[in-house]
Amino acid sequence: MVDVVSEGIPVQDVEEFTEKYKNRRKQQMMRFIGSTAVTLISCRLAITRAKARHYVPNMFQLNYKPPVVTYKGETGPALVLATGITVGTLSMLVSGSCWIWDISTMKEFREIKGFSSEKVEHPRLANMPLESDSMRNVYERLELLNGKK
């Protein structure tokens, strides 16, 4: 005998759905944590590079001494760090938002935001009759819009 939850859904289906849902949320979390790690590592490297260039004067020396600059040797790593920080921050924003909204693919994003080129209808929800309170509320709002009240 199969255990049945309310509305005739077998417990096995519920357990399978729950397991898939947990794996999906775990994958979304790992994407966010990975992008956070990239951002933090890039920021940490940028800060240590900036501290290495800091000039600390000895007693009776000028407060500012122009640093020795070799543009060829410093431009590439600086560009890589800036790109890492920017891409990491953007990926944190995107993966965090997708984690909050429970979106894993672009197809789901299009369906949720209504950008889908194909019309997706949910027949169970489209033709459901309204209950009496909801129907009365709809008619009252229509009367207000038409100016009858």
From Swiss-Prot:
GO cellular component: membrane; mitochondrion
Top-level taxon: Eukaryota
Cell compartment(s), UniProt: Membrane
Membrane topology recorded in Swiss-Prot or TrEMBL: Multi-pass membrane protein
Record flagged with keyword Transmembrane helix: yes
Disulfide partners: none
Transmembrane is among the record's keywords: yes
Keywords assigned by UniProt, alphabetized: Membrane, Transmembrane, Transmembrane helix
Residue spans crossing the bilayer: 29-48, 79-101
Assigned protein family: Belongs to the AIM11 family.
Stated name of the protein: Altered inheritance of mitochondria protein 11
Organism: Vanderwaltozyma polyspora (strain ATCC 22028 / DSM 70294 / BCRC 21397 / CBS 2163 / NBRC 10782 / NRRL Y-8283 / UCD 57-17) (Kluyveromyces polysporus)
Organism ancestry: Eukaryota, Fungi, Dikarya, Ascomycota, Saccharomycotina
Gene name of the encoded protein: AIM11
